[in-house]
Design a protein with these regions (language model features):
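A contiguous, well-structured pocket-lining segment that forms one wall/lid of small-molecule binding clefts
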Residues: 197-288, 297-306, 335-338, 356-366
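Conserved phosphate-binding/catalytic loops in two-lobed NTP-binding clefts
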Residues: 108-109, 288, 304-327
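Conserved phosphate-binding catalytic cores of ATP/NTP-utilizing and phosphoryl-transfer enzymes
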Residues: 109-142, 330
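Short beta-strand scaffold segments in enzyme catalytic cores
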Residues: 13-19, 144-146, 152-156
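Glycine-rich beta-strand-to-loop/alpha-helix junction loops that act as flexible
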Residues: 78-81, 98, 148, 289-297
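Glycine-rich phosphate-binding loop plus the immediately following alpha-helix
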Residues: 158-203, 226-234
Length: 366
């Protein structure tokens, strides 16, 4: 079964063709990072306009690279939640139109849940691909640490669509904290890669930042860590809280910037690993997967390898950040259990918890 996946929830326009929830035939991504880096973050209106320009060419290219016509496509899967409303509308409108035009079943996909399913792709038919895939699909029960710019969650999957949300961020997601700290210390957007690069040259023990203590041992909080970095930067350059934060980077030298990056990254990743290790000890899953853009962080991978008594096989870097391969992959599993959506009435949902999409429950139809 070949699924055309379409993703446009934030600032990547993507389309992919995935077969049987595991084999990647094409994966096309148009990123807007260069556009939004001028603003220090994603501008929703700019993102939506860029999606409008890219969506049709991206879908066409994905089909061409997969050597597929519409007769070869069995269904369409598209991100409908969560995300920026304007961005979501572009992708879903394209998917709805194509589903009607070509008479294809349409499956609405939850973006955060889909990140987990990037780990289910085990191969590709693209001859020139340099991607390295996991040797096998994860086994259930599966513990998933989902870490991205908008989400930080620990989820225990019992089976496809059957999962429990163990914990989540109570304020900033870890990827959001990376972006904000990068801005504080004068590193470019996006903050994840910038901080990781600077941290290699810094001392992770130079500044000791706190870890949040929460009632739920699996929940996350990064707003306090972000504030602690801000206060430490102010102290390091001899300024108090009244000094404009946007002027702080000019007062830092490169060594200070690297040390702040390394110290922040150390504690942020330690926090993630602490929660993952506790959940592993408590639930003893058969496999562990890391999903989302922050999964590409090499220090996070290193800490997990040192502290978890189980090997983790990672999705390729290109499938950690936003992509449509994960949408098409999850779409296949949706198609096994769920009725397709009505393309005439499907609406986007900018804010939607994974707990509202427990699709293993047959009474819940999207």
């Amino acid at each position: 079964m070949k699924i055309l996946g379409i993703e446009s929830s934030c600032d990547e326009t993507a389309a992919a063709v995935v077969e049987d929830g595991s084999i990647l035939h094409s994966n096309v991504i148009v990123s807007q990072i260069d556009i939004h880096s001028h603003y220090g973050g994603v501008v929703p209106e700019v993102a939506a306009r860029s999606h409008i320009e890219a969506i049709n060419p991206v879908i066409t290219e994905a089909l061409e690279k997969a050597n597929c016509t519409w007769d070869d496509i069995d269904a369409i899967a598209v991100t409908y939640a969560p995300g920026l409303i304007g961005s979501l509308l572009v992708g879903t409108l394209a998917a709805r139109t194509l589903a009607i035009l070509h008479n294809k079943p349409l499956f609405p996909i939850h973006h955060v849940e889909a990140h987990v399913y990037a780990n289910f792709v085990t191969g590709t038919t693209e001859s020139n691909s340099s991607l390295v895939f996991p040797s096998k699909q994860p086994e259930f029960p599966m513990l998933s640490l989902i870490v991205s710019g908008g989400h930080s969650q620990l989820v225990l999957f019992h089976n496809h669509g059957d999962y429990d949300l163990l914990g989540q961020t109570q304020d900033d997601a870890v990827g959001e904290a990376y972006d904000k700290v990068a801005k504080i210390i004068g590193l470019p957007y996006p903050g994840g890669p910038s901080i990781a690069k600077a941290a290699v040259l810094g001392d992770p023990k130079k500044y000791l930042f706190p870890k949040a203590k929460l009632q739920n041992p699996y929940d996350f909080s990064f707003s306090g860590l972000k504030t602690a970095v801000l206060r430490s930067v102010q102290a390091a350059v001899g300024k108090d809280y009244t000094f404009p934060s946007h002027e702080l980077p000019a007062l830092l030298n490169e060594a200070m910037r690297n040390d702040f990056a390394a110290s922040f990254q150390q504690i942020a990743n330690e926090t993630l690993v602490d929660k993952a290790v506790k959940a592993f000890d408590d639930y003893q899953p058969a496999s562990v997967v890391i999903a989302g853009g922050v999964a590409a962080n090499q220090d996070l991978r290193k800490q997990l390898k040192e502290r978890l008594p189980i090997d983790i096989e990672y999705a390729p870097m290109q499938l950690c950040t936003d992509n449509a391969a994960m949408i098409g992959t999850l779409g296949y599993y949706y198609a096994q259990k769920m009725a397709p959506a009505d393309p005439y009435t499907l609406e986007v949902v900018p804010s939607l918890s994974m707990t509202k999409t427990a699709w293993n429950k047959q009474e819940h139809k999207i």
